Amino acid sequence: MKLTLADRKEEAGDAISFFFLPDAPPAWQAGQFLHYTLPHQNPDQRGIKRWFTIASAPHEGRVQVTTRFTADKGSTFKRALRDLPIGATIEADGPEGDFIITDPDQTYVFIAGGIGITPYRAILLDLAHRGLPIHVALLYGNRNDEFVFKSELEALAKKYTTLKIRYAVSPAKIDEFTIRNLISDLEHPIFCTSG
């Protein structure tokens, strides 16, 4: 499928979101990813293709890619993505992946590290949009206190009392004690990790 860059947004920390309009409505499930192709000059060893989670929920109507950028250390692909002009197109294949919620009545523990929050954003917004229950304990670790999507997550947590969120900033760890403390009242949760 062909994707046209419609907008970009600087997120918390060193993350940027890119918003693409697909040439045809892709049928994806929240949590899935696409395989993106971005030809560019002098590609490094990693080449011109990357996999990124679709950070947007299907109802949002556009494909959102959110990724981190590190000064002068990023791949040539990421630099080409960062410099892509509005209106430019790239190719994508997919969607793929089974990192999806098949039973919204089940209780989940989502563990996110850094930019690994992207599939959880899509999943939580999708559940809310469809009016489905959100029985989730989210543990979100990051190297600093600039958590991507924090305001969106907090807004959801205010609306859904069954969404519990705990943040951990390096050097703090999401360890067994943290997990047990957060899920002490949950019966047989399903654990998902990303990042």
Which functions belong to the PLM regions below?
Residues 1-88, 142-144, 154, 170-171:
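Ferredoxin-reductase
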